[in-house]
């Protein structure tokens, strides 16, 4: 039992890193809507759509992360501008964060048809960082430890670039550009945000007339904790059913001497499916299962998402949106 408590505490510390830094919420269905990691993705689908997801991580472990997010995005100016609004709430143990971001993307046409675009995006919003002191070491509290909920609201910004055509895509983005500089020293127990960098790319490979293969990757780094790599692959059947998964692990991208040498990678695998019952609705589900110390202690991670697309008859989409 003691070993389990130490293990869970260590996992939380890797994600939370109290006082000095805060890790962004983790989720597995970012490949279904890139707006969650890149503001330049706004307008990519070239139609008004609403997307929401809920993630219950490490089911069965008390205080494990839970994340709820909703986004809406659309195009303007003949498709040359993308607009998006995103609202998120994330809870991990005693930590609770909420955020609202508005994103703007300028989408440069790279060919006459407009099927190839290079987008530059920026997002601005506010983040509420909170900590429930009642959940922190209640037996032997520290002198400055809050007795109840303590929070601070700070401004923030994010930026990114996203390229796509009908065969492949690539993107780079960074968040927490402003909030990292806001002084929250008066609230010593509130984790301070720090920038997260996202690099992603993927391609589309036809296997037959009705089956496509979509491999992709996501590299995430915060210049503090371990660098995370996701390797993804999906089979697409007739544009209606997506079946695939991911493998997530830590990689040594560059030397981080401040990390302990025997830090466990906390590898995990993801099985996911995405369904399109009709042209307006998309439903997704992902199940993450740990490969490592948490295996056997957690019942896995469940994540569900849903989207609704408002079709505009005035706009003719030249190619389906796979990215």
Protein language model annotation of sequence segments:
Residues 1-4, 110-112:
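Positively charged n-region of N-terminal signal peptides that target proteins for export
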Residues 4-13:
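Sec-dependent N-terminal signal peptides
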Residues 13-14, 104:
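Short, flexible coil/linker elements and helix-boundary hinge sites characteristic
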Residues 16-21:
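Sec/Tat signal peptide C-region and signal peptidase I cleavage site
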Residues 22-323:
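Subset of outer-membrane beta-barrel
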């Amino acid at each position: 039992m003691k070993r389990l408590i130490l293990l869970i505490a260590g996992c939380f510390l890797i994600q939370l890193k109290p006082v000095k830094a805060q890790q962004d919420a983790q989720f597995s269905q970012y490949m279904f809507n890139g707006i969650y990691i890149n503001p330049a993705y706004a307008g990519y689908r070239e139609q008004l759509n609403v997307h929401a997801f809920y993630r219950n991580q490490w089911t069965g472990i008390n205080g494990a992360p839970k994340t709820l997010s909703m986004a809406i995005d659309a195009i303007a100016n003949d498709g040359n501008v993308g607009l998006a609004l995103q609202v998120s709430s994330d809870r991990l143990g005693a930590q609770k964060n909420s955020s609202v971001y508005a994103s703007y993307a300028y989408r440069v046409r790279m060919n006459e048809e407009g099927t190839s675009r290079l987008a530059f995006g920026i997002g601005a919003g506010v983040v509420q960082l909170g900590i429930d002191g009642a959940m922190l070491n209640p037996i032997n509290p520290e002198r400055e430890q809050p007795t109840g909920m303590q929070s601070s609201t700070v401004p923030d910004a994010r930026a990114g670039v996203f390229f796509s055509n009908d065969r492949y895509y690539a993107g780079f983005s960074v968040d927490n550009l402003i909030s990292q500089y806001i002084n929250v020293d008066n609230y010593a127990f509130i984790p301070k945000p720090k920038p997260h960098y996202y690099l992603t790319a993927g391609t589309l490979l036809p296997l037959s007339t009705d089956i496509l293969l979509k491999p992709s990757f996501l590299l995430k780094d915060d210049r503090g904790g371990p660098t995370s790599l996701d390797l993804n692959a999906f089979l697409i059947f007739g544009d209606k059913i997506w079946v695939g998964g991911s493998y997530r692990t830590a990689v040594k991208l560059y030397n981080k001497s401040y990390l302990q040498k025997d830090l466990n990678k906390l590898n995990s695998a993801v099985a996911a499916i995405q369904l399109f019952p009709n042209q307006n609705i998309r439903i997704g589900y992902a199940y993450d299962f740990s490969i490592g110390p948490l295996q056997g202690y957690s019942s896995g991670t469940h994540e569900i998402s849903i989207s609704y697309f408002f079709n505009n008859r005035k706009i003719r989409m030249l190619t389906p949106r796979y990215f």
